[in-house]
Amino acid sequence: SAGADKVFGVPGDFNLAFLDDIIAHNDIKWIGNTNELNASYAADGYARINGIGAMVTTFGVGELSAVNGIAGSYAESVPVIAITGAPTRAVEQEGKYVHHSLGEGTFDDYRKMFEPITTAQAYITPDNATTEIPRVINTALQQRRPVHIHLPIDVALTEIEISNPFKPEVEPQKNVQSYINMVQDKLESASQPVIITGHEINSFHLHKEL
């Protein structure tokens, strides 16, 4: 519904159940990559052309491999949905020792690493899935920045009733008339005007307006 019909990524033991659902989906195609960094670049390129991209990694080793690409998407205003398949909520709450963790009983270390390079983050539970997932996706679309979704494997296996299908929300137009007037005055007063635009023209799809 947001505009991404392909999902990039690398299989891992904490995301396999979710990947089964992606592969079984009629309208979404799974694109496997050689590593997560490549997947993040592929999702970035897809987003630049189609408006938004999505990728899936596994907890720890997988999501950390994607950090460089997601940081690049943030720097260049490219909306990518980075989904991390994670251990069950029970494992995380009990602080169990599992592979790909730091072995200290904490499971939010990697999620915190995504906070400076994503515009929104969500820890998905059965209770908040229908509100948090639309929230972060709409934030990605509106702010043209990547977002991070932490998806415990037990939540991925839970059937959740969706009463209202997802619909992208359009951010209200801010008052930019004063800026338009300023640019117009400068163009009219210039003898040989040249317009040099930034990458935001691509990010916000403003080619026609320009």
Name each model feature, range by range.
Residues S1-L210:
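N-terminal alpha/beta PP-like core and its mobile active-site loop of ThDP/TPP-dependent enzymes
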